[in-house]
Amino acid sequence: MSNRGFTLWFTGLSGAGKTTLARAVECHLKASGRKVEILDGDIVRTHLSKGLGFSREDRNTNIRRIAFVCKLLTRNDVVNIAAAISPYREAREWARQEIGNFVEVYIRCPIEVCRLRDVKGLYKLADEGKIKGFTGVDDPYEEPEHPDVVIETDKETIEDSLNHILVRLEELGYLAPEEVYEDTSVLTDQLIAWGYL
């Protein structure tokens, strides 16, 4: 079994399911004995990137900060899961080059479905003009051109998405077979306990 660190970079629109899937992967990998950290975009913005706005420059600065932390943890054999919209290709590509052991996971979901899942009411605020520069509404989201994994959360269950990610990590040499094919039946209960289902 390889215990080398790597970074899973979850990118996608707000409401696509990045945090939910990040928690699912975290739960599974911790159960297999891995050290795992999640860098959630919302949490990073309130701590590490407090004071940054949503201009292209500020968003890229936010991504560079997340990538810096991921790089440090990766070289110390930690699995990092960055769950951030990260709307611009150039910033994601910079993160890939900077970190090294990097797996881009595109959490694809139609904006109409993301709007339905909008528990924070952000799309509504953006539609009303109360939030400017909101990704997918009045600021672009540049889809990945060659992601390592594509997850379609409007078509797959959480369990299917988790298995898809784990199998791909095995194919890329980041996980051993025994880390992939563990029982995932406890996952749903854990996600319910965390309030994601």
What are these regions (language model features)?
Residues 1-7:
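Extreme N-terminal, non-catalytic leader segments
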Residues 10:
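Hydrophobic anchor at the beta1->P-loop junction of P-loop NTPases
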Residues 14:
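The conserved Walker
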Residues 18:
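Conserved lysine of the Walker
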Residues 23-68:
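Conserved substrate/cofactor phosphate-moiety recognition/catalytic segment
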Residues 47-53, 58, 70-127, 133:
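ATP-dependent NMP and nucleoside kinases share a basic, alpha-helical "lid"
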Residues 108-111, 116-166, 172-177:
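Small-molecule kinase domains that catalyze NTP-dependent phosphoryl transfer to phosphate-bearing small molecules
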Residues 181-197:
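Catalytic domains that recognize anionic headgroups
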